[in-house]
Amino acid sequence: MNDINIVPYFEILEKINKKKNIKSKLHIYSLYNFNPLVLENYIKYFLEQHKINANFSKNAYDQIDQEILSSKFTKRIRNHRFLIIGSDINKKIFFNLNLVDQYFENLKINLKNILSKTKKFKKFNLIFFNSPTLLTSYYTSKSDFIKIQKKIQNFNFFLEKQSKKNKHLILVDIDNLSKLVGINNFYDQENYYVSKIPYTESANNYISQEISKIITAECNDRKKCLIVDLDNTLWGGVLGEEGIDGIDLGKTF
């Protein structure tokens, strides 16, 4: 992934609040363990560059488990084209190994529940955040820090395996994005303390553009390509035995 142009947030607000000629809306259901206001405004802006008018569901943040376990969850997401699950381990301030295990186990259960409840949906994609590395080792011992990083790697590997088995599951590689931006430049600690909005302007640009690319690609019609093995048909078969009479070929054959 190459460097991107960073769009300031004030420009985003100015442009998304202007009236657009885009009539149809794309419905997106989203659940996060942080305040997604800024991130979703960025996603909305970048989707509008592709003539896509995104409408995000209004859900309370940090209610992922409760929402997915709700008996009404399937009904709520049925009319949405995309479901985004964004959970960031660096916004869960714990460095206890058992709690980390529980955190990842909950995410695995949530993922399996969603895939089970949506397997009969025709036009539907689940966009799921993988886990970044820990922001700091300050609050834990070096040995525990290494163990937690290993658990993160194992969880991300689990997600990759699931995405290969489920065509409707698409991963957002937050781990890689955090390394591109720089883990220390990825999070805005002061803003998170005030408003529970975790990411810096640069991080929001990178994450939102990645998500908008995913959504745009899924919404656009895919072209099909037919590959013909001419070596064994025309050249070694018809042309080799019959000649070129009756076959329309260009002047460069």
For the regions a language model picked out, list residue spans one by one.
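Extracellular glycan-modifying ectodomains
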Residues: 1-251
